[in-house]
Amino acid sequence: MACSLIVGLGRSGVGAARLLHAQGHQVVVLERDEGPEQQSKAQQLRDQGIQTELGCPLEFSSFQRWLDDVEQVVISPGIPWDHPTLMELRDHGVTVRGEMAVAWQALSDCPWIGITGTNGKTTVTHLLHHVLSQAGLHAPMAGNVGHSAAELGLQCMDPARSKPDWIVMEMSSYQIESAKEIRPTIGIWTTLTPDHLERHGSMDAYRDIKKGLLQRSDHAVLNADDADLKSRQAHWPDAQWVSSAQTNHEPFNLELWVNPEGFVCNKKGALFPANALAMPGEHNRQNMLLVTAAALQAGLEPQAIERGLRSFPGVPHRLENLGSLHGMHVFNDSKATNYDAAAVALQAVPGPIALLAGGLSKQGDASGWLQLLHDRVCSITLFGSDRNILLGLIRDSGYTGDVTSHPSMTDAVTAAIAQGKKGNASSLLLSPACASFDQYKDFEARGNHFRDMIQQLSRK
């Protein structure tokens, strides 16, 4: 019997294994590590009848015993699409797919809304899911938001569950490049700035991956306020564009904009006040317009959209308001894993700002972020493995505020609070501008740690 080989015991690998097993496939999971966590996960899958092999590195030799029977190899988003082992498998005629492709196969009879972009996609995903759900639609979200797309596919196999009206799927560039068969009914592109270049090699390659998803969508919704997308408007003659910039109308076939009186408008007139979404920042106004355009396309009335926007509680780790401490507003923006996302946060919160930044640095243009440090930040506290890289950038920029550096975020938070009090900061902001993998499992774990620390300090 042909088998499906699943690479890795991460969230996506486990989800793909369980879904394919439920569909009747013979499944074998291969995992490199053999630690206690992997042992526990492996046993859970074995208890479900899924063969799991530990100590299998991502090398061609790990796959050879199954080559005659393999139907497909399913990889997690963290594995580069051009990994030498995957290329060798393809040379032997093996189909290599991402977990998202497995989910699409299970869920393609439901209309998808595919959401991508360098920054903003998680907020748009959560907000659109909320708006559609508040309007009475069954619109589960999954993908790059902490819930495996394959696990959603497995849930939807349950005959006791109603079929989704819409699937709201956040899709990273990693997930898109390994699932080119996905064709959303609605595609949303939030922003494009340099990110993941160490993986994709160039900005053009990164852009082309995201562009592919929108080209395969029946309806494309794009952000006219993004410089990169705006510069390529000729590529999208049939797209729906949105803009929060009141002077940005002429070059675009704008579907939605904000008028000088502060109302969201389309060609029929004003729909509702733009302040229906309480989240701070111009970027969140853009997110709100993208969600509104998609919700209108999905058949919602403006009144229903406004109700959903007004009741939205926000997104963890995205400018998450943690209250106040020593007279400072405290914000958890752990999701800001690059300079552009961190720059957005620096523009959104009240200044002067006591900033916490650091982690595992990424390639990218730091100039805009550095300028905002000069303009809005009274003190900077760095942490993590690449704190000295950031320190060098900050010093070279001529920044004159206080800068301190600590190995761990635990020590950094204590120092940042002291620096913020000293500098009369209005906001204490965790916006790392770096990935989290040097010290944390993911940005959620980093943000949860920060939130826990602030809550403990608030109780003292």
Predicted features along the sequence, with ranges:
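N-terminal leader/targeting and accessory segments in enzymes
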Residues: M1-G98, V102, L300, L457
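Phosphate-binding loop of NTP-binding sites
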Residues: C3, A22, S62-D68, P77-A224, ...
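Nucleotide phosphate-binding/pyrophosphate-handling subdomain across enzymes
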Residues: C3, G15-Q23, F272-C378
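Residue-level signal for inorganic ion chemistry
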Residues: L20, V73, I115, N144, ...
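Short internal beta-strands
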Residues: Q26-E34, L222-A224, L356-A357, R376-S385
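Short beta-strand "acidic-cap" motif of Rossmann-like dinucleotide-binding folds
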Residues: V27-E31, P140-M141, V168, W241, ...
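Beta-strand->loop->alpha-helix junctions that form or flank phosphate-binding loops
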Residues: E31, E53-C56, R97-V102, A142-G143, ...
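C-terminal helical cap/extension that packs against the catalytic core
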Residues: K41-Q48, S367-S426
